[in-house]
């Protein structure tokens, strides 16, 4: 699988309302500690019929549904959570979005990825709708057992925590020890 080319974005904005108004699909990739803030702003903006896909889920689907419930929001949306990211990407050349020369390298793509919706009964509808998302066209979606299963199956804690613990001395003494 290899693609190269230029992606042209229809919109770049810091205004969440502008970004989600009329959108069919809302794809979210935020570190888990940012879910609460992002979802507090997003929840009242959601429109009937939209899908929200969270990469990786890390309990994000549960958090978004809780916020919607607490705010009394009854908008009919499908919320899906993925166990990881579909692509590994790094910004290589950044010009503060002022020119057309920003460069992103995508270094890997998942061949298959686990996903479920909350509630799980929305999964079949989600599968039909998600075919419209070009970023997922080459990735096989595997149905997870539940949103909870998806959230606890992310491999990041297994990969990153041991590395941090093994480097704790270096991290704590960064800049002190020559």
Predicted feature descriptions by range:
Residues 86-178:
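Substrate/ligand-engaging "lid" and interaction regions
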Residues 19-22, 46-47, 108-109:
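Flexible, charged surface loops at secondary-structure boundaries
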Residues 32-99:
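Rossmann-like NAD(P)(H) cofactor-binding subdomain of soluble oxidoreductases
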Residues 24-25, 51:
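Structural motif
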Residues 16-17, 35, 123:
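Residues at or immediately preceding the N-termini of alpha-helices
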